């Protein structure tokens, strides 16, 4: 009969092995679930920001909304257009533009073919780009108008939020919609190019066109270039009805929820097999000792 201490050591080793297996499975599950769950959480926050903005604007007096839009048009007319460069002395004025709700949200952008509906914020600070789409200072405010070009940028490839991850899937002819104040502006994709970060020539104004350019990093995960997707203003009536709150189910999120029970079942199976390895051997030893007695 083995000493009692030896038996306790073996049991302790088995317990440690079980705990290690459980910890390993839980860690793997958390690593697997983090991207889709974080993306789902951020999507809900972005959706809430869009809904909150639209509700707040709808409650404003029409005269107040028109006044803010008139101020934005005057700002665009006087703007020395230079993407990414705005004198510090002009920053306060810029931040006051399109401030309908007392927040930094100046509007929303919807890309129906990608299931994207995001708030647009002033500046391209990192905190902004983690939360939604940023407007590049020094470019036209996104209110439309011939001879203007608003440049909007978003992150691509964040594990916690999709944002502009699928921007490369847009094709010429696709539509995106900008909502700011009581204006709803549709743009049809006309140009898609890749440039170096320093090549800002592709972002210049065109006197007879009303343009919005969407910018993100490319190639995916390498980010040495910039993908520029430019849309030209089109009649909203030609686009048809677009629901602002259209629902799309992320297949990655579905896969994550399907994976949870699979992980749990796998954990149970492994633990049972681990215990079954020990059980027959110890039972055999116990019976042989009993026979000797």
Predicted regions and their residues:
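Solvent-exposed, non-transmembrane regions of membrane-associated and secreted proteins
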Residues: 11-254, 279-289
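Solvent-exposed, low-complexity, intrinsically disordered
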Residues: 1-4, 284-293
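Alpha-helical transmembrane segments
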Residues: 261-276
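Cationic-aromatic interfacial patches
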Residues: 2-12
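A general, composition-driven signal for non-globular sequence regions
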Residues: 7, 39, 266-267
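Single-pass type I membrane protein transmembrane segment
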Residues: 256-260
């Amino acid at each position: 009969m083995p000493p009692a201490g030896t038996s306790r050591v073996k049991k302790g080793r088995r317990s440690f092995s079980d705990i290690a297996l459980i910890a390993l499975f839980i860690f793997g599950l958390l690593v697997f679930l983090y991207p889709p769950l974080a993306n789902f959480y951020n999507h809900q926050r972005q959706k809430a920001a869009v809904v909150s903005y639209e509700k707040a604007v709808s409650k404003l007096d029409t005269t107040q909304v028109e006044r803010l839009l008139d101020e934005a048009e005057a700002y665009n007319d006087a703007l020395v257009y230079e993407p990414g460069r705005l004198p510090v002395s002009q920053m306060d004025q810029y931040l006051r533009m399109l401030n309908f709700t007392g927040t930094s949200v100046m509007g929303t952008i919807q890309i129906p073919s990608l299931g994207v509906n995001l708030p647009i914020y002033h500046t391209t600070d990192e905190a902004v780009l983690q939360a939604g789409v940023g407007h590049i200072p020094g470019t036209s405010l996104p209110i439309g108008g011939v001879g203007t070009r608003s440049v909007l940028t978003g992150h691509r490839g964040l594990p916690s939020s999709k944002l502009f991850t699928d921007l490369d899937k847009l094709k010429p002819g696709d539509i995106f919609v900008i909502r700011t104040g009581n204006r709803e502006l549709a743009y049809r994709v006309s140009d898609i190019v890749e440039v170096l970060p320093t090549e800002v020539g592709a972002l210049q104004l065109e006197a007879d066109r009303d343009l919005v350019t969407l910018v993100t990093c490319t190639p995916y995960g390498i980010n040495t270039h910039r993908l520029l997707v430019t849309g030209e203003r089109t009649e909203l009536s030609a686009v048809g009805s677009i629901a602002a709150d259209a629902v799309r189910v992320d297949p990655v999120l579905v896969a994550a929820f399907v994976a949870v029970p699979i992980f749990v079942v796998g954990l149970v199976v492994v633990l049972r097999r681990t215990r079954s390895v020990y059980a027959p051997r110890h039972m055999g030893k116990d019976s042989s000792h009993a026979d000797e007695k």
